[in-house]
Amino acid sequence: MAAAAAQGGRSGGIGGCIGAGGASNCGTGSGRSGLLDKWKIDDKPVKIDKWDGSAVKNSLDDSAKKVLLEKYKYVENFGLIDGRLTICTISCFFAIVALIWDYMHPFPESKPVLALCVISYFVMMGILTIYTSYKEKSIFLVAHRKDPTGMDPDDIWQLSSSLKRFDDKYTLKLTFISGRTKQQREAEFTKSIAKFFDHSGTLVMDAYEPEISRLHDSLAIERKIK
């Protein structure tokens, strides 16, 4: 009898998932599943401390980055980051050489090499400061759009942002550089971060993604017209 009851329960469960004409009506949340398939970021909602400015900016930056890479299928270029890492690596090399040389040739014999390494290290730090200030600026993403025909160079899309300390105004700038003409165009918005986060500090992509898409589409339309 227990087996029959179990079988009946299973049959009832299956029957509850089948509607008229044998169509499946299981409540699997198909609408939400479709949304999750489209936006991977929604698999793990971004939740931060709303009073932590760095966390707020980083979460908005990362989410904007995901929109360009996942929705528009652009390919990230790591050239800017590689440049910074190269400078840092060279700086660390001078520091390591100074450490090893001083171990092998105790001071004051190591004095000339130590002086050279120290000077070189600070020169590289100066170069790094110039690089981050004038080359990287506030850019956190460089992405390439491949030409479908393979005839023209890649179009370049750049994302940069700013959020001043103790300010709730977040600015996101999207820059488009034509691979064919090298012309550059920009679009940006400045919004209160309260528009994009709920009371618990969770990023609301339904409010944030359309703003990014509007920026992108405004530049994409200009590109097609020209």
UniProtKB/Swiss-Prot annotation:
It holds the Pfam family SPC25. One of its GO terms (cellular component) is signal peptidase complex. The chain crosses the membrane at residues 87-107, 112-132. Residues 2-86, 133-226 are cytoplasmic. It is a multi-pass membrane protein. Residues 108-111 are lumenal. The modification N6-acetyllysine is found at K169, K191. GO terms for biological process: protein targeting to ER; signal peptide processing. Its main location: endoplasmic reticulum. It is found in: Endoplasmic reticulum membrane. Keywords: Acetylation, Endoplasmic reticulum, Membrane, Transmembrane, Transmembrane helix. It comes from the Eukaryota. The modification N-acetylalanine is found at A2. The keyword Plastid does not apply. Component of the signal peptidase complex paralog A (SPC-A) composed of a catalytic subunit SEC11A and three accessory subunits SPCS1, SPCS2 and SPCS3. Component of the signal peptidase complex paralog C (SPC-C) composed of a catalytic subunit SEC11C and three accessory subunits SPCS1, SPCS2 and SPCS3. Within the complex, interacts with SEC11A or SEC11C and SPCS1. The complex induces a local thinning of the ER membrane which is used to measure the length of the signal peptide (SP) h-region of protein substrates. Component of the signal peptidase complex (SPC) which catalyzes the cleavage of N-terminal signal sequences from nascent proteins as they are translocated into the lumen of the endoplasmic reticulum. Enhances the enzymatic activity of SPC and facilitates the interactions between different components of the translocation site. PANTHER family: MICROSOMAL SIGNAL PEPTIDASE 25 KDA SUBUNIT, SIGNAL PEPTIDASE COMPLEX SUBUNIT 2. Belongs to the SPCS2 family. This is Signal peptidase complex subunit 2. It comes from Pongo abelii (Sumatran orangutan). The lineage of its organism: Eukaryota, Metazoa, Chordata, Craniata, Vertebrata.
